[in-house]
C-alpha cells in the first residue's frame, strides 16, 4: 500500500505539471487518461482532495456515464445537478471542471468503489446505483449524490450492508 501513495502523488504532480504547460483549451486533468479511475481510487485522501481542487478534465463526465454507469451523459448531468450546456461546452473545449463540479463527480467514483467492493462486480454496482432504493425515499443512489447529505446516506447504506449492521 505504501508503494501506491508515492505513485499516486507522482500522477497528480504529472497531471498538474502537464496542465500548467498545456495550451488554453486543452486539459490533461484527471479523467482523460485510460488509467485515471484506478489512479484516483488508489490516491491518498489528500491527493484526491488536491486532484478535485485542481479540477478533473471535463471528459470524465462522459467516461463515468458511459464506461462506469452505462447511462447517457445527460442522465448523469441531471442526477448531479450540473448544467448541461456548460459541461458539454467544457467537454468540447477540453476544459477542466470546477472544484464543485469535480467534487460531484468524485462522489460518484467514491460510491461506485464502495458498491463494487460490496457486490464484487462493477456491473452490479452500476446497476445498484441506477435503481430506486427504499432507504432513499425511492430515489436512485446516483440521484442523491449532488449534495453532501445524500452522499453521506448512500455511503451509510453501503457500509451497513458491507459490515452487516442492521438499521
Regions found by a protein language model. Give the residues of each.
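Non-transmembrane "mature" sequence context
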Residues: 1-167
Amino acid at each position: 500500500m505504501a508503494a501506491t501513495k508515492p505513485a499516486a502523488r507522482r500522477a497528480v504532480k504529472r497531471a498538474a505539471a502537464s496542465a500548467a504547460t498545456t495550451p488554453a483549451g486543452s486539459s490533461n486533468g484527471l479523467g482523460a487518461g485510460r488509467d485515471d479511475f484506478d489512479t484516483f481510487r488508489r490516491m491518498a485522501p489528500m491527493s484526491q482532495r488536491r486532484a478535485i481542487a485542481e479540477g478533473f478534465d471535463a471528459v470524465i463526465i462522459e467516461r463515468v456515464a458511459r464506461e462506469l454507469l452505462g447511462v447517457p451523459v445527460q442522465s448523469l448531468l441531471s442526477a448531479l445537478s450540473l448544467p448541461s450546456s456548460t459541461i458539454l461546452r467544457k467537454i468540447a473545449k477540453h476544459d477542466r471542471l470546477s472544484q464543485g463540479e469535480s467534487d460531484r463527480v468524485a462522489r460518484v467514483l467514491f460510491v461506485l468503489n464502495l458498491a463494487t467492493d460490496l457486490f464484487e462486480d462493477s456491473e452490479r454496482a452500476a446497476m445498484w446505483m441506477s435503481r430506486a432504493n427504499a432507504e432513499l425515499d425511492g430515489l436512485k443512489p446516483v440521484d442523491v449524490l449532488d449534495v453532501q447529505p445524500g452522499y453521506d446516506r448512500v455511503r451509510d447504506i453501503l457500509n451497513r450492508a458491507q459490515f452487516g449492521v442492521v438499521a
